Design a protein with these regions (language model features):
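A short N-terminal beta-strand-loop micro-motif at the entrance of redox/enzyme domains
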Residues: 5-12, 17-31, 40-65, 87-91, ...
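Glycine-rich beta-strand-centered segment in the early N-terminal region that forms part
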Residues: 51-69, 80-123
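Conserved beta-strand positions in the Rossmann-like core of class I SAM-dependent methyltransferases
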Residues: 101, 205-207, 271
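NAD(P)H dinucleotide-binding glycine-rich loop of Rossmann-like/cofactor-binding domains
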Residues: 109, 119-184
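Mid-domain Rossmann-like dinucleotide-binding core that forms the NAD(H)/NADP(H) cofactor-binding site
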Residues: 156-229
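Short amphipathic alpha-helix with an adjacent loop that forms part of the alpha/beta core around
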Residues: 231-242
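Glycine-rich phosphate-binding loop and adjacent beta-alpha segment
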Residues: 253-313, 346
Length: 346
């Protein structure tokens, strides 16, 4: 086998020692790719050179064109979420889209040259991330063909936010004539969730910053509240004395979520995507507490893509950044609530 470089870090970039690399059909043997990694939980993200991954049995090698950024990526890198098993250096990123560059033995689901997208949370965590130029994953992962009419940047943006918005709302149906309060409505998941809730017949109250208010109103919400100018609780109680039927909270910590859940009527439901809902405590006031976890499937990806192409759903605005901008963007993202969707163009 040939000797090529492995990673060692200085000045935010990679340097090298030697290690073996197998040749990959469709990819030059010995090729080095760039990726964003952390060396340990809580370490600063850096751009590194890594050996190109190989497509093992049952795997596809994807030459990524774009990767969607998610709050989960910051949570993982910081160590706030520590799934097991994990490996370091940990390649970050879950959502991506690109071209099938190589096929491992027995990987018959896709063909070379196919445009595919999906959510690639692979065990051990960190062994395959989308903040990289290439990724090798099992062909049975939540992947789907990118339909004609949807570009790869747009496809990379939607796996987590579109899948979450669709399946979260469907888990709460029927929602017809229900009042749904969405906290963090201007972000990616919020943009999809409020649109699917409106389609389901809900009256949506969207907590959103002024900069995104016009866009969110265009989705058909009944009311918007900017919590930087007026208190959400006071505003909601004034218009809904008996409480709202459903709370969907995409951003709050445990303390803030518990306070907002007091706005839900007895018999209603309070959902957290940050896993901070205390179901036992909420049940004491007659509220069902739910910690939502996305279980992505290829079918969900196909449905979201079709809804986008049919104009049934409108994607949030995309901000494009380069791989080199990711470390600083992640640091800023840990301090600020984002609006729309950020995508790394590779």
């Amino acid at each position: 086998m040939d000797a090529i470089t492995i990673w060692g870090c200085h000045n935010g970039q990679a340097s090298a020692e030697t290690a073996p690399l197998l040749g990959i059909r469709g990819t030059p043997k010995g090729k080095i790719v760039r990726a964003v990694t952390v060396s340990a939980y809580g370490a600063s993200p850096v751009v590194m050179d890594l050996p190109t991954p190989a497509a093992g049995p049952g795997q596809v090698l994807i030459k990524l064109a774009a990767a969607g950024m998610n709050p989960m990526d910051v949570t993982l890198a910081s160590g706030e979420w520590r799934p097991e098993p994990a490996t370091f250096p940990m390649v970050l990123g879950v959502d991506g889209a690109g071209i099938v560059d190589a096929l491992g033995e027995g990987a018959a689901r896709f063909s070379l040259g196919d445009r595919i997208f999906g959510q690639l949370l692979i065990s051990p965590i960190g062994s395959a991330g989308t903040y990289a130029e290439y990724v090798a994953v099992t062909a049975e992962a939540p992947l789907a063909l990118v339909p004609p009419g949807l570009d790869l940047v747009g496809a990379a943006a939607v796996p987590t936010i579109g899948g979450s918005g669709l399946t979260l709302v469907e888990s709460l149906e029927p929602l017809e004539e229900q009042t749904v309060l969405v906290i963090g409505a201007g972000g990616g998941v919020g943009s999809f969730a409020i649109q699917y809730a409106v389609i389901a017949g809900a009256r949506v109250i969207a907590n959103v910053r002024a900069s995104a208010e016009e866009r969110v109103r265009s989705y058909g919400v009944a009311q918007t509240i900017d919590d930087t100018t007026v208190p959400v609780g006071e505003t909601v109680r004034r218009g809904h004395r008996d409480g709202v039927d459903v709370l969907i909270d995409l951003v709050s910590d445990a303390e803030s979520f518990a306070s907002l859940a007091s706005l839900v009527r007895p018999g209603g439901t309070a959902v957290s995507t940050r896993y901070v809902a205390d179901a036992r405590a909420l049940s004491a006031s007659g509220v069902r507490g739910v910690n939502f976890v996305l279980r992505e499937t290829s079918e969900v990806l196909e449905r979201v893509a079709k809804d986008l192409l049919d104009g049934r759903i409108v994607a949030p605005p995309i901000t494009r950044i380069s791989l080199d901008q990711v470390p600083s963007t992640m640091r800023a993202g840990s301090r600020h609530r984002s609006e729309g969707k950020m995508v790394i163009v590779l």
